[in-house]
Amino acid sequence: MSRRPNFGGMGMGGMNMQQMMKQAKKLQAQMAQEQENITAQEFTGKSADDLVVATFTGDRKLKDIKIDKEAIDPDDPDMLQDLVIDAVNKGLSQIDEATQASLGKYTKGLM
């Protein structure tokens, strides 16, 4: 009868499964806390000359949008559209950057 080698319950560099699960839960809790911190923040994107300002919550919900009356030109609605798009995209980019800075330390080895 062949016998399996006994590694003393160790694997993965000397860490047993119970220790690995404990470490994974700890990391998961830390990531959840980081995400909660991001969600609690507000992020603001501004167009050129601050004519349009878009404010988001950290969970990517548009909270407020302010449009300066100088941005409203009935003869050029495309300009206002471009300003809104610019402000919104900048606000969303801020959320992405904050998320990457905060959670990237946990995920960089996984990709």
Curated annotation (Swiss-Prot):
InterPro entries documented for this protein: YbaB-like_sf, YbaB/EbfC
GO MF annotations in UniProt: DNA binding
Subcellular location: Cytoplasm, Nucleoid
Disulphide-bridged cysteine pairs: none
Keywords, alphabetical: Cytoplasm, DNA-binding
KW DNA-binding (keyword) present: yes
Subunit structure of this chain's protein: Homodimer.
Matches recorded under HAMAP family: DNA_YbaB_EbfC
Name of the molecule in the record: Nucleoid-associated protein lhv_0401
Protein's organism: Lactobacillus helveticus (strain DPC 4571)
Taxonomic path: Bacteria, Bacillati, Bacillota, Bacilli, Lactobacillales
